[in-house]
């Protein structure tokens, strides 16, 4: 048997034996609070569409308007003919809103994170990351020529001990951690990095749009401005793509040397057109964030007495189970009661910390939270 085939079959068999096999579910209802799968309807508590913009008709119309003007695709790299007025307007809207000189667009958050670290870092640099950072950041750190260190999750003292004034450091954290829903102590990290003359980068995929007075995210809430800010459009924006916010020189550097940017087809101009509308909607429609605050309170009131409850100030609500098989059982029992929640297992989270990753969106209702609470109580009682 060829080595590749043997290796593939062995890896798949091991994954199944450990109870960690994953499958793809085909849904028919789009990204909404109610989803349809295999002929059944569920209340969807697994969507990252935090502000409920993905199916907002104003945003759908903006997509349609963009399509009528620009067609379906960009047709080229941004460095050739793929950068339209729609892309330029989106970059301008982002920089004005978030207070940076440049915004460089990418097709995904994964791509943006990889591009940033692989382009910026050299062998003489030291990269210091929170140990719970996203896989895209960790992989990029391992692939980069820099020396990578990891500090204990949100541990400022440990971070400080890893910094020195002699080395060229880049410190990277998420603003909101995707599996735990907790926030990084950004003000403290900014103070420590500044004292060591280090650069600071924040991946705010899950904070942008949701936190801060204008929806400016974790950094707006903490009143900090890192040298580098990564925002993604696949969560609160209701679409996909990402941008790196930075100063003029760094923006020019990424434009010239970031291979993910130079050698990729630009995102569709109609998408950029719609994203520009989303930027305005996020800032102007604060009622969406207010609705999330209300739902957070309803979630706490309904579930705080259950073993596994974890309180967060964000839309991400980890419900801790422990073992992978138990997490799958609870998720399955919830689905039998019309609740779609996803069991998160290793290697996404550390062994022994499997959980349900519950997410709230502005399209949910208090009544749906009550239904979730009852389904969880019933599922846990059956273990």
Swiss-Prot record:
Which positions are annotated as binding pyridoxal 5'-phosphate? 109-110, 178, 206, 232
Tell me yes or no: is Transferase among this UniProt entry's keywords. Answer: yes
Q: What Gene Ontology molecular function terms does this protein carry?
A: 8-amino-7-oxononanoate synthase activity; pyridoxal phosphate binding
Q: Which SUPFAM superfamilies match?
A: PLP-dependent transferases
GO BP annotations, alphabetical order: biotin biosynthetic process
Domain of life of the organism encoding this protein? Bacteria
> EC number(s) for this protein?
2.3.1.47
Which is an annotated Pfam family here? Aminotran_1_2
The pathway where this protein functions is: Cofactor biosynthesis; biotin biosynthesis
The residues listed in the UniProt record as binding substrate, with positions renumbered to this chain, are: 22, 134, 348
Which family does the entry's similarity section mention?
Belongs to the class-II pyridoxal-phosphate-dependent aminotransferase family. BioF subfamily.
- What role does it play? Catalyzes the decarboxylative condensation of pimeloyl-[acyl-carrier protein] and L-alanine to produce 8-amino-7-oxononanoate (AON), [acyl-carrier protein], and carbon dioxide.
On assembly, the entry states:
Homodimer.
What name is this protein filed under?
8-amino-7-oxononanoate synthase
Q: Gene that codes for this? A: bioF
């Amino acid at each position: 048997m060829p080595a590749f085939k043997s290796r593939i079959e062995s890896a798949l068999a091991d994954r199944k034996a450990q109870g960690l096999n994953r499958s793809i579910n085909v849904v028919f209802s789009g990204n909404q609070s109610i989803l349809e799968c295999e002929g059944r309807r569920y209340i969807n508590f697994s969507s990252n569409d935090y502000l409920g913009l993905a199916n907002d008709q104003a945003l759908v119309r903006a997509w349609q308007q963009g399509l009528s003007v620009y067609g379906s695709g960009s047709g080229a790299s941004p460095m050739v003919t793929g950068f339209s007025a729609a892309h330029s307007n989106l970059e301008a809207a982002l920089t004005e809103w978030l207070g940076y000189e440049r915004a460089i667009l990418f097709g995904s958050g994964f791509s943006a994170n990889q591009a940033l670290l692989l382009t910026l870092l050299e062998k003489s640099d030291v990269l210091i990351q929170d140990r719970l950072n996203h896989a895209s950041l960790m992989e990029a750190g391992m692939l980069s020529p820099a020396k990578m260190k990891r500090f204990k999750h949100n541990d400022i003292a440990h971070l400080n001990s890893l910094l020195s004034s002699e080395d060229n450091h880049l410190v990277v954290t998420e603003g909101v951690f995707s599996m735990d829903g907790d926030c990084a102590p950004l003000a403290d990290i900014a103070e420590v990095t500044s004292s060591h003359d280090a650069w600071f980068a924040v991946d705010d995929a899950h904070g942008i749009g949701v936190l801060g007075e204008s929806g400016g995210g974790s950094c707006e809430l903490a009143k900090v401005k890192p040298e580098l800010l990564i925002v993604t459009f696949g969560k609160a924006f209701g679409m996909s793509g990402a941008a790196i916010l930075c100063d003029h020189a760094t923006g020019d550097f990424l434009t010239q040397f970031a291979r993910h940017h130079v050698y990729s087809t630009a995102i569709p101009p109609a998408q950029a057109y719609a994203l520009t509308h989303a930027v305005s909607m996020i800032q102007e429609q604060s009622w969406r964030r207010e609705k999330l605050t209300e739902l957070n309170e309803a979630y706490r009131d309904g579930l705080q007495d259950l073993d596994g409850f974890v309180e967060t100030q964000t839309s991400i609500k980890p419900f801790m189970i422990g073992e992978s098989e138990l997490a799958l059982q609870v998720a399955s029992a919830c689905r039998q009661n019309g609740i779609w929640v996803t069991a998160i297992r290793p290697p996404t989270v550390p062994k022994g910390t499997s959980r349900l990753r519950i997410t709230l969106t502005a399209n949910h209702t208090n009544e749906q939270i009550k239904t979730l609470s009852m389904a969880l109580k019933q599922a846990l009682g059956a273990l």
